[in-house]
Amino acid sequence: AIIGKINILIAKGYLDSAQVLVDKQKMILNKFQSHSSKKNLLNKLNYKGTQILFYKGNYNEMNLSLDSLIQEIELQNENCNDLLEIKTISLFFNQDQEDFKKYSAIQHKIQMNKSFESLLELIQLMDTENMLINELAQFQYAIIELEKGNIENAQKIISSMNQKTIFYELSLIINAEIEDHINKNYEIAIKLYEQFIEEYPNSIYKENILKRLNKIYKLLMKDLDL
């Protein structure tokens, strides 16, 4: 229930109030040393605290909190992947902390369902000379457009990415999946999947793509039999 209240405050933009609630609950928990689920609850509260620091754009504080939490939690923890993803992204901004403030503000606006403002600010972030930040902004813009149903625009943005970053790699997969699952253009999807495997033969996504290609081939063979 407490985590839910904190989430509501964050979603409404009340980051300071959310932090006060996090700190208050941590103080209460620390009084009950024998509490059976104390560690789990503390990790959840620390996760929320780290999230608040992220949304506030406090780069150094957020990283310290993030590193501490990553060391504390187990790999099976529900927030582990999110924390590792945030850590990876934060490294892109090591020399561009002003851009980190912009990026974190955008993420908070997305959390508050302010997609129009988010898109405008992502466009501004694309002007950066940092290649990773540039393609991160493009990639996120494309994802928002995709979620809004603006498929063609999403594909245009994806097609403009060519810097061979992790986001370029992911964009190739998304473009193939759009043709595959949304447009049902299986022949185009096959070409895009095969292009991906050719460019990234050692990708962690290769096995799943090969499985999907096999299913598409079977679908096309079934259509030919009909």
Where does each model-flagged region fall?
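Acidic, polar-rich low-complexity tracts and alpha-helical solenoid repeat scaffolds
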Residues: A1-L226
